[in-house]
Curated annotation (Swiss-Prot):
It comes from Saccharomyces cerevisiae (strain ATCC 204508 / S288c) (Baker's yeast). Residues 1-60, 171-393 are cytoplasmic. Residues 1-21 have a biased composition (Low complexity). It holds the Pfam family Reticulon. The keyword Nucleus does not apply. One of its GO terms (cellular component) is endoplasmic reticulum. It is a multi-pass membrane protein. Residues 82-149 are lumenal. This is Reticulon-like protein 2. It is found in: Endoplasmic reticulum membrane.
Length: 393
């Protein structure tokens, strides 16, 4: 009576526990040795595996097998020889096994069954190696990396013993406490993600120097847009610091850009050896240096302050370009009338390097013609070419 009452109480208690924790009912229709559905078989296989691994760890199996082999051979040899000497017939050859066991018939079904599974295994390996699913490729690659580190630290036998213990314990614990373990894993995952987002800026600041060392910043044409955006940001910050308006700051930038443009054009033209020449002058003669050299007095009279030509820059937002060009054209025509040959390579004006300085004539000079000037850059290019000619001469 009392025994039945105690049994019923235990059964009700177990049912209430299973109702409160439905995810921890146990086994959940899973069968196999590792889930201990049959404790006797699972315990026997677990014990046999551990004992065999311990034997392999403490005993040299190859040495034992070789010792057993030569002992069997020496024993059969001694018995066969002694019986032939004493009885004229060998006992071992007479009463020994006359036919070999049919190992092929026993092993062939098992081998065929395993070979039938081989094509599917080959297909899975092929898809894994050639990354048909990158997630599986990455997951198994990480697993192999950790296994490599594990085998580098521990011996193979130790790893096998640890694997056997985990194989027979971890699935059973997870099967019985699945809901609780899943909640703990989700909590840890959320905590890691929260900490990562919280410390994201610190991680970026600490890793940025190392990333710059591994991947240096681009300096080629591909980084042109990035450099332009950075330049715009720096100019904006500079304008805000100086307290200038946008129009005043743009005028300052245009002036500095025109100055730098002169220097860069002069350097590039000199490096490429592109010198403007007159129509009747050969470029080979100019590069060989055989042309007539003008005197220093003639050079000073014609080209004062030649190293820094007075070339104005224009802002199209504040200056009328056509009016300025007309004024420059009138100024150049007046200089040409006065004898200041400031252009090289034109059809109307001779080259001052190949033609000597003009002498005074009593005859009436020919009527001068106006030379069209496209823009102020023409004057700068021609005067710079004359300077390079004189330097090479």
């Amino acid at each position: 009576m009392n025994r039945n009452t105690t049994t019923n109480k235990n059964a009700n208690l177990n049912n209430s526990r299973n109702a409160n924790a439905p995810g921890e009912a146990g086994h959940q229709n899973k069968t196999g040795l590792i889930y201990w559905t049959n404790p006797s078989k699972s315990g026997a296989s677990f014990a046999a595996t551990l004992v065999s691994l311990l034997i392999l760890r403490n005993v040299n199996v190859i040495s034992v097998l070789l010792k057993i082999g030569y002992m069997v051979l020496f024993t059969s040899f001694a018995v066969e020889l002694s019986t032939k000497v004493l009885f004229d017939k060998g006992v071992v050859s007479r009463f020994g096994m006359q036919e070999s066991p049919d190992l092929v018939g026993v092993l062939k079904p098992h081998i065929d069954r395993e070979l039938d599974r081989l094509p599917a295994l080959e297909d899975r390996i092929r898809k894994l190696v050639f990354a048909h699913r990158t997630r599986n490729n990455f997951t198994i690659g990480v697993s192999l990396y950790f296994l490599h580190g594990l085998f580098a630290i521990f011996s193979m036998n130790t790893v096998l013993i640890m694997t056997t213990i985990f194989l027979y314990t971890v699935p059973l614990i997870y099967d019985r406490k699945q809901a609780r373990i899943d909640r703990a894993i989700d909590r840890m995952k959320d905590l890691v993600i929260h900490r990562f987002h919280k410390n994201y800026n610190k991680v970026v600041e600490k890793t940025e120097p190392y990333i710059d060392k591994i991947i240096p910043p681009q300096t080629d044409e591909g980084s042109y847009s990035t450099s332009i955006s950075n330049e715009n940001k720096s100019s904006t910050s500079q304008r805000n610091k100086s307290g200038l308006s946008s129009s005043e700051f743009d005028n300052m930038n245009d002036t500095s850009a025109s100055k730098s443009g002169k220097d860069s054009y002069s350097t590039s033209q000199y490096n490429r050896a592109e010198y403007p020449v007159s129509q009747n002058e050969n470029i080979g003669t100019l590069k060989s240096g055989k042309q007539e050299i003008p005197t220093e007095k003639d050079f000073n009279n014609r080209h004062e302050n030649f190293s820094k030509p007075d070339v104005k820059t224009y802002d199209p937002r504040t200056v009328d370009i056509e009016e300025e060009l007309a004024a420059h054209q009138r100024e150049l025509e007046q200089n040409l009338k006065d004898g200041d040959y400031n252009l090289v390579g034109s059809k109307e004006i001779p080259d001052p390097i190949t033609v000597p300085a003009p002498t005074r004539h009593t005859t009436k000079p020919a009527e001068s013609q106006s030379i069209p000037i496209k823009n102020n850059e023409t004057l700068h290019k021609t005067t710079h070419g004359l300077k390079q000619k004189l330097q090479h001469a």
